[in-house]
């Protein structure tokens, strides 16, 4: 479950924003399901199906998507070089390096915004596919969180929104319709 500010949720719900940049990522193989929790604030947005949705006060889960790919964002440069390092997309599998321009466009971020957010660290671009906006927002209490323990994942009742994201049990399909 991802906590996202209303202005970004509007862009995701409209299909304008197709990548969400985060400092961390789940230890899951892609594809995986992610739920969209909108933080405090009023939200009116046009869903992909054309209807206008309202979420007054925020603080609700408004939809879900499948993350089918996660890009690794890191700084590339040469130690001691007068040329400053720049953020790029790197592949763990073949160590190829790609320019970050397309990711920034899909995430609706500028390069300075990315630099400010990552503050010299690494990041991850979560690709959004199969977006589904619910007819009615869902309460946080309807979801079960999963906490990592030395014995495996332990379920717990979610009482407050995650700072960035948290693991949750997937809801059954008939429950999300």
Set out the residue ranges of the language-model regions.
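Structured alpha/beta reader/binder surfaces that contact nucleic acids or chromatin modification marks
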Residues: 1-177
């Amino acid at each position: 479950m991802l906590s996202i500010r209303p202005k970004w949720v509007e862009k995701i719900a409209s299909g304008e924003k197709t990548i969400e940049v985060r400092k961390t990522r789940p230890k899951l193989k892609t594809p995986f399901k992610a739920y969209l929790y909108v933080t405090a604030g009023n939200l009116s947005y046009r869903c992909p199906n054309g209807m206008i949705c309202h979420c007054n006060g925020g603080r609700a889960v408004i939809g879900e998507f499948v993350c089918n790919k996660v890009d690794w964002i890191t700084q590339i440069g040469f130690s001691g070089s007068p040329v400053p390092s720049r953020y790029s997309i790197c592949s763990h599998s073949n160590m190829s390096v790609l320019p970050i321009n397309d990711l920034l466009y899909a995430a609706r971020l500028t390069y300075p915004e990315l630099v400010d957010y990552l503050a010299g660290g690494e990041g991850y671009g979560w690709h959004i596919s199969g977006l589904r906006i619910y007819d009615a927002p869902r309460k946080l209490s309807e979801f079960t969180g999963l906490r990592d323990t030395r014995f495996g994942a332990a379920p717990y009742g979610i009482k407050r929104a995650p700072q960035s994201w948290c693991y949750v049990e997937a809801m059954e399909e008939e429950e999300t319709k």
